[in-house]
């Protein structure tokens, strides 16, 4: 293993590999710049970085999510509610596990800083209307994060089409390196 932060040959090889991987992911999701691609150790770490990264900018605020999110999201939001004073609205899903975009829109308040909705649910197979929710968030000027770990390699990941500000992917789902 070479340290990609080093300036010797053993370190330069992984540095180039990481740079190439960033370009590949940028192209896969249609991100504007490679600097928008951040690698973490897991999907959970990525979810935490996205959510906590936004909430660090503010003392408190409001976040919208659904009632069927992955524990990476629910535990992070529970922490923010109970230790940092954030208010979290959990929009319901219908009998098929779908979020109604209108419910998200109706839940947005002046202090809403973030909406975070899972793209695809691996337990029940639901694919959320991410593009519709993304359009609402853009219109209301609210940041939008989607946990797309289960969608990687299967569904459209174009962040411009989906109107997603932050997307969590997991390398194990898209043949990424460990």
Feature locations, PLM:
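Pyridoxal 5′-phosphate
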Residues: 1-178
